Amino acid sequence: DLYKGEILGIVGESGSGKSVNVLSITNLIRPPGKIINGEIIYNNTDILSLNTNDLRKIRGNEISNIFQDPLSSLNPVLKIGKQIIESILKHLKLNNINAKKRTINLINNVGIPSAEERYINYPHQFSGGMRQRIMISIGLSCDPKILIADEPTTALDVTIQAQIVNLIEKLKIQYNMSIIWITHDLGLLAGLADRIIVMYAGRIMEEANVTEIYEDPKHPYTK
């Protein structure tokens, strides 16, 4: 379960199934991977039962993703403004002028100065931390109800990591959204998450609020 306004941390070693599980929420699993059974309930609807068009209305709109490596996630030959505005034009049905204004506001909201000038820059003109801020602005472009952050600070140095964590915490309140935060860093989740799920070999080993996980872990793997 994911509750409104909470940050749910999913933690586990590499290969434990963290990313695969959350990619299945919006059916982004690449072949030959596939969902065999089960259900994913969002707003009383099983996402797995939706056709492609209905799923697209949710993906990138009501449920959005921030991926681990912004350099490989951003298109190197497209200006960042065009990459942000794409979802806005598709889901919010704004005209080009208002969509551009919204895009510039998003760039500004994630802490990138001179947003109007940076709108026409390419990904290679940004630092790693700034590229991740661009990814965050893409994730927030349509005011999602749920933001899935898949190890969004892994490729960044410690100082920039802290800035990105603080930024996402602030934006969670501003946009009134829930967050699923995937990481292998238990220390990071200590001051960030409300609840934590511990995974190993594709299975949930333990689930509890953050205080219980740290003060009284039940499963040997968590300990």
Question: Could you tell me what each predicted segment is?
Answer:
Residues Y3, I35-D46:
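Conserved ABC transporter NBD signature motif
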Residues E13, N27, I148, P152, ...:
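P-loop NTP-binding/switch modules centered on Walker-like glycine-rich loops
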Residues D46, E86, I97-E117:
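Conserved ABC ATPase "signature" region
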Residues I47-S64, K90, E212-P217:
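ABC ATPase NBD coupling module
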Residues P76-L89:
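Q-loop/switch helix immediately C-terminal to the Walker
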Residues N121-F126, M130:
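Conserved ABC ATPase signature
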Residues S141-K145:
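A short, proline-enriched helix->beta-strand linker immediately N-terminal to the Walker B motif
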